[in-house]
């Protein structure tokens, strides 16, 4: 029951900071969230890929070709890890600059969101109370049927299901009524929040477009700086890949040549 109210509160009020609001944790920056997800994904791909390479090399065909893919894979992952370490501070700087430039707008929107959240909290509390009462009423109606089933024989199962069906439909219909009522109560505040956001953006536009143009110019500037600072790391990645690719090509050509010799000798 609490999960329903929690979900609604998260949906209407907390947005991307829901974890911080409910758990009182320090909110992660956008870069921290992206970095964590990317790290988990890359590590999973890396470990999974290495397992496949190891399985192939252990196979009869892998042993016959002797491509040394596992050594090349380890070299590749080491190079990618080095690239990630080099680019990490650069991308962190980009996110820090972007957050700094939009701090005022984010503070204003957070203030609006907090105000709306306080106004709709009574409606959420009322919904929680009504939902609890409906569930308790349903439990009271179902309890005698459960006792009847325990006391009766198996053939009464169908009869019990027939009795439970209308009760379940009644609970669903009454829940829909409460949800619709809650939606109607929250609608004005949702519209109000949208209007405030539109007003904030309109104010930026009416400022001669200077503020929006400034945001765009600064974002472009930060992206250009990120691109320039990442070039050396990307070049290091390319240079690191060349020996790996060359080793793979030599091993593959040697394996093909060996196979051709065996065919000609037959």
UniProtKB/Swiss-Prot annotation:
This is Apolipoprotein A-I. Its main location: secreted. One of its GO terms (cellular component) is low-density lipoprotein particle. Homodimer. Interacts with APOA1BP and CLU. Component of a sperm activating protein complex (SPAP), consisting of APOA1, an immunoglobulin heavy chain, an immunoglobulin light chain and albumin. Interacts with NDRG1. Interacts with SCGB3A2. Interacts with NAXE and YJEFN3. The keyword Phosphoprotein applies. Glycosylated. Palmitoylated. The modification Methionine sulfoxide is found at residue 109. GO terms for molecular function: amyloid-beta binding; apolipoprotein A-I receptor binding; chemorepellent activity; cholesterol binding; cholesterol transfer activity; enzyme binding; heat shock protein binding; high-density lipoprotein particle binding. Residues 1-18 form the signal peptide. The gene is APOA1. Participates in the reverse transport of cholesterol from tissues to the liver for excretion by promoting cholesterol efflux from tissues and by acting as a cofactor for the lecithin cholesterol acyltransferase (LCAT). As part of the SPAP complex, activates spermatozoa motility. It comes from the Eukaryota.
């Amino acid at each position: 029951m609490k999960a329903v109210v929690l979900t609604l509160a998260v949906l209407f009020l907390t947005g991307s900071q829901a974890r911080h609001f409910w758990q009182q944790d320090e909110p992660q920056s956008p870069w921290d969230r992206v970095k964590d997800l990317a790290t988990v994904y890359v590590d999973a791909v890396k470990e999974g890929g290495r397992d496949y390479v190891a399985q192939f090399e252990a196979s009869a065909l892998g042993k016959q070709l002797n491509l040394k893919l596992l050594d090349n894979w380890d070299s590749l992952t080491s190079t990618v890890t080095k690239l990630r370490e080099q680019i990490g501070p650069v991308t962190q700087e980009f996110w820090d600059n972007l957050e700094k430039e939009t701090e005022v707008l984010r503070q204003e929107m957070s203030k609006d969101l907090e105000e709306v959240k306080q106004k709709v909290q009574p409606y959420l509390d009322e919904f929680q109370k009504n939902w609890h009462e409906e569930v308790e009423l349903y439990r009271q109606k179902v309890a005698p049927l459960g006792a009847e089933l325990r006391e009766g024989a198996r053939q009464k199962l169908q009869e019990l299901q027939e009795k439970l069906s209308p009760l379940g439909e009644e609970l669903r219909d009454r829940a829909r009524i409460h949800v619709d009522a809650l939606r109607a109560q929250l609608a004005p505040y949702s519209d109000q929040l949208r209007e405030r956001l539109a007003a904030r953006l309109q104010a930026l536009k009416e400022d001669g477009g200077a503020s929006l143009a400034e945001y765009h110019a600064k974002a472009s500037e930060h992206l250009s700086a990120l691109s320039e600072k990442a070039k050396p790391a990307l070049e290091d990645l390319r240079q690191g890949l060349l020996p790996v690719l060359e080793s793979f090509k030599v091993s593959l050509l040697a394996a093909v040549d060996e196979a051709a010799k065996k065919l000609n000798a037959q």
